Amino acid sequence: MFKKISGVNKEQAVHSLKLWAICFFQYFSNRKLSRIIQFVERTTNTLDEKEQEEEKAMQTSVIGFPRIGTLRELKFASEKYFRNEIKAEELLQTAKDLRKAHWMTQKEAGITFISSNDFSHYDLVLDTAVLLGIVPKRYQELQLSALDTYFAMARGYQGTSGDVKALAMKKWFNTNYHYIVPEAEDDTVIHLSASKLFDEYAEAKELGIATKPVVIGAYTMLKLCRFTGEKKAEDFIGDLTAAYQELLKECQKQQIAWVQFDEPALVRDMDAQDVELFHRLYDAVLQEKGNCRVLVQTYFGDVRDVYQDLTAMDFDGIGLDFLEGKETVRLIEAYGLSRTAFRLTKSCLRDLSMERIFGRIITRKHCRR
């Protein structure tokens, strides 16, 4: 269950885990803390005979990696670019250097599934909007470079090519971060129109790292969009579905093993129409996944309104929130997981309290059959 740490024996590791659980007492109820410590004690008794087997089975994934740089390199380079002190090539090189450093840090740490496309020059929602061709006409008409059009959407533009304000910003769920609100017009044609996701995958592959591309999922993207004309969200479902299908087809062409769809909107209150919309999108999208495995990643809470639907669908992995997701453990204990996707035994289910600490993604390979 645990990776072997050089120079640390079993007893030291178990003792450290107990102390760690106690230090994080404020995040857990007495009952859950007790279950964590009981799990650690059970592990002590079984670690010896299962050590090699569990080490092979243990895999780790991160949702994404901070992009700004340890010395805020991205911030300073971006500000210089906005002041016309450096050219686009220098900004792009800084970004490339940061991505390399971040990927290598994760590789050296032994992370199994390292994310790509989690880097952004400004905002990941804006990145996804550009990926899907959701670019309002007023920005296209500026006839700027792709990079400057992107920044015009994020910051506004006043110059020889025109004068436009930035897109609106809204709070990103329950955080202090604000995202750029995508804006779909009546004549917007959603389609796969940018290559950033695949470019960064290829960039990491040149370093010997096969990454897990990350992109905001279709349901969350539709919920975050602002529709400025006569059309409503449902009018864009067909094109949006086709765009994500095309994305998965391209992933297969490039032999990408895993792709992560971030769906934090699933933790919000969902009525029957919302659940139906989620099915309508992903029942179609997942038909095109082929050999590419799809992880649906949630965060900022639990998915109580869609949990049973989620586990019954053809996802290959589900990322659940065991910190802010107050109902997550109860949902798993009450409803279990899909037999086809997650073959959990009772012993594995009892150990799920540790998922809250380690934040592991539960997939087929993590569970005893």
Range-by-range predicted roles:
Residues 38-57:
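Short, Lys/Arg-enriched N-terminal segments with co-localized hydrophobic residues
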Residues 53-369:
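Domain-level signal for soluble alpha/beta catalytic cores
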Residues 12-15, 26-27, 38, 52:
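Low-complexity, intrinsically disordered or signal/transmembrane-proximal segments
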Residues 8-10:
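N-terminal, intrinsically disordered charge-dense segments
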